[in-house]
């Protein structure tokens, strides 16, 4: 595996001599705009592999994306290779319908320490929940970013990531009540502890998430990619583009239903993905918002 090939894949051309917050932010932003958050392997009949060599091959050599366990594993390797002090952490994702956090540790995120300060770095949540900058590990502080205002809160050794969202405008009235729309203005995202993890800690959950009928990842095919002003999402046959804060503290969300023939073109033109096997788009009933 070659760090230069990774940096070329994400389009990062600047110096990486300084292990500072600016460099870390730049690498994160390049990755989230180049590497989609996606689970298309499952819906092409392939496995979502946790091995670093397999992830490198998929993302760097074959120009694909992956889900959190893959893209954040790759980012962990890249940041560590560059010289950042990086730790894997495990997260518990909030379920809006159940009104509780997952019992299983289903999310991989990173902690990076720079000059004695700790930051949360996550390139693998996608959609309008994706951080664009590292979050300083401070409890109760609002941290405004382009997508929203993020807030970390600590209680009894558990940390909670929440977001304060804008209003949203959907010009196509056909989609005003889409099940993909987020209703909450204040949204809980996930919880985590600062206990260091290894990729082996996620192996059983990686299998469960891609095989269980109750998993959102088997229920829906999706692909999400950040842009300089928003985010593209493809869920099943539904394509959306969200423009953050297009006016008056409001996000603009445009919807389009694609035909099967259009999906291949959209994957290539918007997400820069060419699949080797046939995708079977799926929009099941598990809760998933953009």
From Swiss-Prot:
Changing residue 251 to V: In allele NAT1*22. Its main location: cytoplasm. The active site is at residues 68, 107, 122. One of its GO terms (molecular function) is arylamine N-acetyltransferase activity. SUPFAM superfamilies: Cysteine proteinases. GO terms for cellular component: cytosol. It is found in: Cytoplasm. InterPro entries: Arylamine_N-AcTrfase, Arylamine_NAT_domain_sf, Papain-like_cys_pep_sf. GO terms for biological process: xenobiotic metabolic process. CoA binds at residues 103-104, 208, 214. Keywords: Acetylation, Acyltransferase, Cytoplasm, Transferase. Its EC number is 2.3.1.5. Substrate binds at residues 106-107. Changing residue 117 to T: In allele NAT1*5. It catalyses: an arylamine + acetyl-CoA = an N-acetylarylamine + CoA. The modification N-acetylmethionine is found at residue 1. Participates in the detoxification of a plethora of hydrazine and arylamine drugs. Catalyzes the N- or O-acetylation of various arylamine and heterocyclic amine substrates and is able to bioactivate several known carcinogens. NAT1 was historically considered to be monomorphic in nature but reports of allelic variations at the NAT1 locus suggest that it is a polymorphically expressed enzyme. Belongs to the arylamine N-acetyltransferase family. This is Arylamine N-acetyltransferase 1.
